Swiss-Prot record:
It comes from Pectobacterium carotovorum subsp. carotovorum (strain PC1). Belongs to the peptidase S24 family. GO terms for molecular function: DNA binding; serine-type endopeptidase activity. The lineage of its organism: Bacteria, Pseudomonadati, Pseudomonadota, Gammaproteobacteria, Enterobacterales. This is LexA repressor. Coiled coil: none annotated. Keywords: Autocatalytic cleavage, DNA damage, DNA repair, DNA replication, DNA-binding, Hydrolase, Repressor, SOS response, Transcription, Transcription regulation. It catalyses: Hydrolysis of Ala-|-Gly bond in repressor LexA. Its EC number is 3.4.21.88. CDD domains: S24_LexA-like.
Length: 202
């Protein structure tokens, strides 16, 4: 499995986009300039890391000697810690990409979210697991959702009644979270569609 850091993914995306726009890869200097590196040498180090992971091939002796090897469409971004008020899929929140086919989940997964805590343990969602999430606001009562309440993101079972939303844990030690839609900001970020046990990828 090829796992890219957020910075490595930025370099990879820049190479891919440059090829799509110009028909050729960028030079080290262009990568450094675009991503704010201090020198082309810093870009070279990231390219070497990408080559070691097998997602690009470096062709020696050519300033634009970069060839893409990774089929990007099988990668699902892993969202790390989310800062208050910022979009869940903002680039700076993406820790890495997991080479998992999104279509193995129904509906397909758009991103992975690292589970924190044991509030959903009774249905097999454990601390440290990677929750596969389909990005949608179209959810029904009884489904496991990723919800945002006043800038905090949580994973719970949804129960909506009029202006009140109850987010239910699957662990009797955790009380429901009650949201009054007339007073609090609330949105649905996505629907849980599966779990990847993190130990499966070690």
């Amino acid at each position: 499995m090829k796992v890219l850091t957020a910075r490595q993914q930025q370099v990879y995306d820049l190479i891919r986009d440059h090829i799509a726009q110009t028909g050729m890869p960028p030079t080290r200097a262009e990568i450094a300039q675009q991503l704010g590196f201090r020198s082309p040498n810093a870009a070279e180090e990231h390219l070497k890391a990408l080559a070691r992971k097998g997602v690009i091939e470096i062709v020696s002796g050519a300033s634009r000697g970069i060839r893409l090897l990774m089929e990007e469409e099988t990668g699902i971004p892993l969202v790390g810690r989310v800062a208050a008020g910022e979009p869940l899929l903002a680039q700076e929140h993406i820790e890495c990409h997991y080479q998992v086919d999104p279509a193995m989940f129904k509906p397909s997964a758009d991103f992975l979210l690292r589970v924190s805590g044991m509030s959903m343990k009774d249905i097999g969602i454990m601390d440290g697991d990677l929750l596969a999430v389909h990005k949608t606001e179209d959810v029904r009562n009884g489904q496991i959702v990723v919800a945002r309440i006043d800038d905090e993101v949580t994973v719970k079972r949804l129960k909506k009644q009029g202006n009140m939303v109850h987010l239910l844990a699957e662990n009797e030690e955790f009380a429901p979270i009650v949201v009054d839609l007339r007073q609090q900001s609330f949105s649905i970020e996505g629907l849980a569609v599966g779990v990847i046990r993190n130990s499966d990828w070690s």
